[in-house]
Amino acid sequence: MMIREFKDIPFELNNQEVLIDGEHFRVYPDAWPACDGHLLFVPKLNTTEYITKTLSETIAYGDNLVETGKIDGYHFGMNMGEPAGQSVMWPHVHFIPRHKGDVEGFPGSVRLAHRGHRGSEYYGFHPEHKDEYRKVHPFIKWKDEGELE
């Protein structure tokens, strides 16, 4: 179900830590991070103008981290719709920092960027996170304990 107002997004309802409070967006740490530094840039209005400004600020943030040598590169992107993996039905931009050597064999793949083996396989079966993760991600089909369909 699409969320109608910014005040109703889970990050606000759960009083999640706000890392940056910009004019058009807020930045929160991702509750299910792919790696350290995985952030969500969330526009305050669901409009093209606010989404565009949020994307622009995400890029500026990443470029600054690269220019200052804090990271080597970054991914950013949006999941639009449940089939694409969206679980919070309000636009938000994922920012995933990257470091040289963080993935063996296939550098650059965001699917392999999970430090400490985090991702669906980790959160979906971890005793501390399993119930909440599966509730928030109902579209993932769990075959049995230990395997994704």
Model region roles, listed by residue range:
Residues 1-149:
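HIT superfamily nucleotide-processing domains
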